[in-house]
A protein has these predicted regions:
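Hydrophobic alpha-helical segments at protein termini of multi-pass membrane proteins
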Residues: 1-144
């Protein structure tokens, strides 16, 4: 399946982490206010106000298939440009939400220099992993 649309696999993990991280990265008030207090700039933020699972469901059932179709159907090299935009956009957001979630979970609560430096380790590992996946996917794209 990766050979049919390798560019999709270059950003799919980033989208999943971004969408799920958006929900889990919401402040404590989000969960106690009936979903009224939230942090999200996406135009579909009203879905977060209805229910977090609705937000996840809509994002994954509409956005994932759309991005799959987008990089499959757009002509070369524009499809590569679209994949790069998705990698950069969702990559930035997924790292942001990942870090917010770790801080909210109390994994890195210290404000000293060592705690702040150590808080970068999970993000570095994550970035290395998703960039390797993207690299391998793009490599398959150029080989085909």
């Amino acid at each position: 399946m990766i050979k049919k649309n390798p560019l999709f696999y270059s950003f799919v993990i980033l989208i999943l982490v971004d969408v799920i991280g958006t929900v889990f990265g919401q402040p404590k008030e989000y969960w106690t206010s009936g979903y009224k207090v939230f942090h999200e700039a996406l135009p579909i933020f009203p879905l977060l106000q209805i229910h977090p699972l609705l937000f996840i469901l809509v994002c994954l059932s509409i956005w994932l298939p759309f991005t799959y179709w987008l990089v499959l159907r757009i002509k070369k090299p524009i499809n590569l440009w679209a994949a790069m935009a998705l990698i950069i956009g969702h990559g930035y957001n997924s790292v942001f939400w990942f870090r917010v979630s770790l801080f909210q979970a109390g994994v890195f609560t210290g404000r000293d220099q060592l705690s702040m430096a150590l808080s970068l380790v999970p993000m570095t590992v994550y970035v290395l992993f998703v960039s390797w996946v993207a690299f391998k996917s793009i490599q398959v794209y150029f080989i085909e």
